[in-house]
């Protein structure tokens, strides 16, 4: 069975507090984009789970951990081979690992006819990472709390988007720790207010200030893209910068920025 595992971007990411368990409270607007990894699932007779992915040890892979947990929890027969063809950059703020884990939950549910409802799948996901909870679905959403509160968010049309990744791997935990030490928490806005904002006002990311201070090359990249479009933002804790605009404008940005940074990764696609 082949399954696509779609990348996620944050159209908005505000850090609004921290709870008693030291988890950050967030207000995010997330959407999937038409850029994905491909996971191949194959049942095997031998009682073993194998995950094949370049440059990542099996035991450290979220996919392996999630699959092992579900096999134990539901006493599933035989084993499973999972091959991951990676396209989504690692440590890039695109939730590639979380998306792969969510795809695995959905795939095992389907392969073994578990008939899990969304709440049951979210409960599994919450044990491995809050980003996985949103990644179980494919619609734009307002995501709050520590990532467990999800409501559909009204975005009227699919948007053209250019992804630019500067080949920097960023550890999310480090960025949040630095944010706590240096910055104040933001005030959340009502869903109706957020849905009424135009795109330029919606696009905000509190983590940019931390990442830009540590990685000035990412700040420089954003400034250079802003010369062509105002709808530019870093996704998640970085390092990816994206721009949403008309296709003609995005093609021009791609052409001009690639002259400066030919070694960066570029993806021209659409939101889902």
Which role fits each region the language model picked out?
Residues 1-92, 110-120, 144, 154-155, ...:
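ATP-binding N-lobe of GHMP and related small-molecule kinases
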Residues 49, 135-137, 141-231, 244-263, ...:
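Conserved, helical-rich catalytic subdomain that frames metal- and/or nucleotide-binding sites
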Residues 45-57, 104, 126, 195-205:
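Short, basic/glycine-rich phosphate-binding loops at helix/coil junctions
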Residues 6, 79, 138, 234-239:
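Short Gly/Ser/Thr- and Asp/Glu-enriched loop/turn motifs at secondary-structure junctions
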Residues 83-112, 130, 231-243:
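Glycine/serine-rich anion-binding loops at beta->alpha junctions
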Residues 105-142:
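Contiguous, small/hydrophobic- and glycine-enriched helical/loop subdomains that border
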Residues 13, 37-41, 131-136, 141-142, ...:
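Short beta-strand scaffold segments in enzyme catalytic cores
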């Amino acid at each position: 069975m082949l399954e696509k595992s779609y990348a996620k971007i944050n159209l908005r990411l505000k850090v609004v507090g921290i709870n008693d368990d030291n988890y950050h409270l967030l207000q995010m607007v997330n959407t999937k984009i038409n850029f994905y990894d491909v996971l191949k699932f194959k049942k095997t007779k031998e009682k073993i789970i194998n995950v094949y992915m370049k440059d990542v040890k099996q035991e450290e892979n979220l996919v392996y951990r999630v699959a092992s947990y579900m096999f134990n929890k539901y006493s599933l027969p035989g084993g499973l081979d999972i091959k991951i063809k990676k396209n989504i950059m690692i440590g890039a703020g695109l939730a590639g690992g979380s998306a792969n884990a969510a795809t695995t939950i959905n795939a095992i549910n389907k392969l073994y006819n578990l008939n899990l409802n969304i709440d049951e799948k979210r409960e599994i996901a919450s044990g491995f990472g809050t980003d996985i909870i949103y990644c179980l679905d494919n619609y734009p959403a307002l995501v709050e709390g520590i990532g467990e509160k999800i409501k559909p968010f009204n975005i009227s049309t699919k948007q053209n988007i250019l992804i630019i990744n500067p080949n920097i791997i960023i550890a999310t935990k480090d960025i949040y720790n630095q944010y706590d030490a240096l910055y104040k928490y933001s005030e959340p806005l009502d869903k109706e207010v957020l849905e009424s904002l135009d795109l330029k006002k919606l696009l905000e990311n509190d983590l940019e200030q931390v990442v830009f201070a540590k990685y000035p090359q990412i700040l420089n990249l954003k400034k250079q893209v802003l010369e062509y479009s105002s709808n530019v933002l870093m996704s998640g804790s970085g390092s990816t910068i994206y721009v949403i605009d008309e296709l003609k404008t995005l093609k021009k940005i791609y052409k001009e920025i690639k002259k400066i940074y030919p070694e960066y990764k570029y993806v021209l696609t659409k939101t889902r």
